[in-house]
């Protein structure tokens, strides 16, 4: 009897093995902030372990899907205004809006996509 497991299936099974996947906790601060048009705004995101530069920032408005702003920590998604910028690597990252505009009032999220250590 052939006991070999297809590589694709093995990969899926590994996701369910306790301890096989690293739990990376993300902490964003501040949780809320007050700002006015023209303000410089900085949001910080910290990872519980190094994720290199595998971090994305999203903007979400009520009733809308999240919009990708920044990927790989500092790369600006096409069409996103240059007042948005991202920086950082390892465990600490920042999203900066250089001059807040009325259209920028929204919820912002960071997301890591380094699933394995």
UniProtKB/Swiss-Prot annotation:
One example of a Gene Ontology biological process annotation: adaptive immune response
Keyword Acyltransferase on entry: no
Places the protein is found: Secreted; Cell membrane
Chain segments carrying region Framework-3: 79-110
Keywords on record: Adaptive immunity, Cell membrane, Disulfide bond, Immunity, Immunoglobulin, Immunoglobulin domain, Membrane, Secreted, Signal
Region of interest: Complementarity-determining-1: 46-56
CDD domains, A to Z: IgV_L_kappa
Sequence segments annotated as region (Framework-1): 23-45
Domain of life: Eukaryota
Signal peptide (UniProt feature, chain positions): 1-22
Region of interest called Complementarity-determining-3, as start-end residue ranges on this chain: 111-117
InterPro entries: Ig-like_dom, Ig-like_dom_sf, Ig-like_fold, Ig_sub, Ig_V-set, IgV_Light_Chain
GO cellular component terms attached to this protein's record: blood microparticle; extracellular exosome; extracellular region; immunoglobulin complex; plasma membrane
Region feature Complementarity-determining-2, mapped onto this chain: 72-78
One example GO MF annotation: antigen binding
One Pfam family cited in the UniProt record for this chain: V-set
Impact noted for substituting residue 72 to D: In IMGT allele IGKV1-5*01; requires 2 nucleotide substitutions
Region (Framework-2): 57-71
Predominant place of localization: secreted
Record domain Ig-like: where: 24-117
Biological function: V region of the variable domain of immunoglobulin light chains that participates in the antigen recognition. Immunoglobulins, also known as antibodies, are membrane-bound or secreted glycoproteins produced by B lymphocytes. In the recognition phase of humoral immunity, the membrane-bound immunoglobulins serve as receptors which, upon binding of a specific antigen, trigger the clonal expansion and differentiation of B lymphocytes into immunoglobulins-secreting plasma cells.
Subunit relationships: Immunoglobulins are composed of two identical heavy chains and two identical light chains; disulfide-linked.
Protein name (Swiss-Prot/TrEMBL): Immunoglobulin kappa variable 1-5
């Amino acid at each position: 009897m052939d006991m070999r497991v297809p590589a694709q299936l093995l990969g899926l099974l590994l996701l369910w093995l306790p301890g096989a996947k690293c739990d990376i906790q993300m902490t964003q601060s501040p949780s809320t902030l007050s700002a006015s048009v023209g303000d410089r705004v900085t949001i910080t995101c910290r990872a519980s372990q190094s994720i290199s530069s595998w971090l994305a920032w999203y903007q979400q408005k009520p009733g809308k899907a999240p919009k990708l702003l920044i990927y790989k920590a500092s790369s600006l998604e096409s069409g996103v205004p240059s007042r948005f910028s991202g920086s950082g690597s390892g465990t600490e990252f920042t999203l900066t809006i250089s001059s807040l505009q009325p259209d920028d009032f929204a919820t912002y999220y960071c997301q890591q996509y380094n699933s394995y250590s």
